Every structure is written in structure tokens, then in C-alpha cells.
Amino acid sequence: MPVSSLFSFGVNLIHRGGRARPLQSIYRMELRFGLFLSVALIPVIFAQDISHGSIVVDGTMTVAQTDDNFVCATIDWWPHDKCDYGQCPWHYTSVTNLNLSHPFLAKAVQAFNNLRIRVGGSLQDQVQYDVGNLKSPCHPFEKMKDGLFGFSKGCLHMERWDELNRFFKETGVMVTFGLNALHGRHKVKRSLWGGDWDSSNAQEFLKYTISKGYHIDSWEFGNELSGHAPGGFFEEEWFVKLLQTSGSRVLDVMSHHMYNLGAGVDPKLISKILNPDHLNKASYTFGNLTHVIRRHGPWSSAWVGESGGAYNSGGAHVSNTFVNSFWQTLIGGNYGLLNATTFVPNPDYYSALLWHRLMGKVVLSVESDASPFLRSYAHCSKGRAGVTLLVINLSNQTNFVMNVQNSINLKLAVNEQNMNQGGFTHTLKKTFSWVGTKASNEALFREEYHLTPKDGYLQSRTMVLNGIPLEFTDAGNIPSLDPVHVNLKSPISISPLSIAFIVFPNFKAPACG
């Protein structure tokens, strides 16, 4: 299909270099980890209740798969004078002026080992590339009353592009770059643009990138051009139409954005975050999106391109504290993984890093008899045998004490009970002790990573791991993220308003290979 007709929808897509191929569906996992966005916005209330229960993990089959680089972060285009609700939180963190030589920045990125970085955001459709026969001067973004998002066109010098790619190579990141989809088009009215896309500037930019040997994993076309459409917020009709019109093997990925908390200034932010029913609303989006992809574009996959929780730079004193275990921007705004001025990691950096290191691609089924305020998710462990469980306690007053069970052993216990009536209780207790491991005389342990805010203050800027505050070392390195080893036979205790990663190295899960 000709470029002009394919892109006439003015929507967002991602194309990866080489032969088109489907990717693992990140959206499938976003349903699970998207609920890991925040724990609370109010002071800690010490446990008043203790609730006992069970978590059952089914390791016999895969229910979904994520991409290898599920965790990703954005380097945005917003200039320092981008302001929302009387605050200007972006500072000098733009693609064009971020201090790439800051030692904290490189070390924070390298700790992920192949972090996906998206270069893009709202202003990407105003960016010109200073290469080839550019017909206008290459000026930085400036405030402009009638401009898109209140700014003029901006420009990326190739010297800066060279610097960025040196940084990408040195830190081992995987790059997704968002192209300007409005070049050559004209504004018809407030949110409507007409005319054909002029691909000449993008083509010159691509040629330059290839000539320099820079490896860009994927190219994204446009950003929220139509609001509720691909590259923006999910709307079934738009997604179906694009897949039907483009046809087989044209689009590798359909991306959409998630800001299910609403505006960062919303006074109801707290109640939304602590309400499991509100968090569950995301499941409808993912369910519908799954249906659309399977029926109309099974060659494609879906990515959540942005998921900052609250839009318009996030919530001040919320998105940059312990309560925000979501991520979107690498640095800048209130929802960055790193502080915009000191480059020191915000609390959610560490929860994202632990996810990246511990949770593998294969998603397993989990069932729990606990209240909806305890959220449980299981994956095959990353790079090792066993299963890793993520547990989030959204309750501000209940301590959950949970036995973790393997569905395989439960089935064995039921079969044994059928053969020997009257011994079921004893058999079940015996089953609970092994959590899916093969019988052994040696002491067995699990690894636990409990995340809490410093001094119990949920809007703290310091994350605490197993009672130890996480802070840069004197040499400016990321601190060690060490687990505590707990006897496998003991139940798991999840304190109010906390997050825990639990690794079971010997969990028997055929789906994990």
C-alpha cells in the first residue's frame, strides 16, 4: 500500500526493521502489571486485621506472554517551560537537552540490561530533522499560543542524534523512535489536520540513521493524533478499520495509551488508586483489544506506548513518590523513574527494576481466596528455574498471611483423597509444605523482596527493601537489591500498603520448561 494512503488515518503504528513479524503482546501483561500502578496516597495505618488465605498458582499452562522488554521508559520532547497546574516539572530532561554525560543516568539505565527506551511523546509530531534539504530553520521548541500543545515546531540536530546514539550504545538500550506524522499536513481546525504526509524529511532522517550504523529496534508513527485511536486511547472501530485497510503483515504493533487515573490534579486520585473496582476497569480495554487483534490482525501485537497513570505530567507529590509503582518517562515530569534535577532514582524505579530482573515472559494463572485488595500475579522466573510471585496489598489495615500452593499438588491431593477417604486434611497440609517441589530432606527456602516507604510515609521519596533504604552508594552506583531467604514451609506475610516479589526457585511448573 502506498505510504500516503496507509498513513492517511493519521494514527500511530510501530514498524520494526527487517521482515515484519508479530511481537509478544505487551498489553496482555499490562492487565496484570498495570494494576501495580500505585499502592496508596495516605499515611500508613498500622495493621488492625490479620487475614489468612491461600494463593494457588497453576504452572501447567501459559495463559499469556509478555515481550522480553516489558518495562520501557520514554525520553520525551517537552522543554523546561512545559507547565501544568502551576508547576513546571520537566526541567532540562528533553531529547534535545538531557545531560547524557551525567554518571547517575548511565548507571540507572545500565542496571536494567537492555531497557527499552522510547524517544517520543506529544511534541514528536512537531519535530523536524536537521538533515537533507530541510526547508525551514532548525530552531528549538518555543511557547506558541496557537501551536500544537502550546508550542512551535522544534528540531533535532544530527549532532545531537549522534550523541543520543552513543548513549544508547554505551548503555545497551533498545530504541523505539517516534516519527513526526504531521510533516506537510496543515491544520484545518483545533484538532483536525488535513493533507498528505510529506515523508521526505523522515526518509532523509532514516537514511542518515542507517548510514551511521545506528540500530533502531522499532519506528513509531505519530502520537495521539486522533485522541481515541491507535497511538492514543483504545477505540475498537479505529483499530479494526486500520487493520482491515492496511492488511496482512503491514503493522507489527498497534500501540495505545493508558491514563486510567485521569488528570494529575484530580482530587479523587487517592480513592481511584485504592479502589480495586476502578483498577479492574482496565480489563475491559484489554479484553476488547485482544478480540480485535485476534480477529482482524493476528499478525500484529499490541503495546501500551504510554502508561503514566495520571496525565498532564502526573500528580505532584504522588507520581514521584513510593505510591507510584507505575512508569512512563525515564526522566522528567512527575512520573519519571529518575528525579528531573538530581538524576537520583524515584521509588518506582526500584519496583520497575525488580520486575525487569525477576519476572519472566510466561504468565501463569493465579487464584486467591483473599479480598480484592490483595492482588497476586505469577510468572515463570526470569533467566532461572522456578516461579516468581508478585503480591500487592492495597488495604491500609489488613495484613494478609497467605499459603502459596501449586495446583499440581492440589490435584494429587484430591486423587489421593479419593483413594484413601478420611486422610484428605493430612494430605492437603503435607501438600502445602512443598509448594510444588520434589521431595527432599534438605531445607528449602524462597527469596522475598518486600518494598515499603521510608518511615511508613507513603509519599516518601525513598524506597525501602526488606527494611533497608535504597540509596546510591558513595561511588554513585545503584544499591544491591538483595532478598531475604525464608523457609519455604512458612506462610507469606504481606503488610498493609506494601509490595512483595516472592521467588520460588524449586516450584514445579511444566509451563516454564
Please describe what each predicted stretch is.
Residues M1-I26:
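N-terminal secretory signal peptides that target proteins for export/translocation
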Residues P2-V3, L23-V253, A282-G305, A310-G513:
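Non-catalytic accessory regions flanking glycosidase/transglycosidase catalytic cores in CAZymes
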Residues P230-F233, H257-T285:
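Substrate-binding/catalytic cleft of secreted carbohydrate-active enzymes
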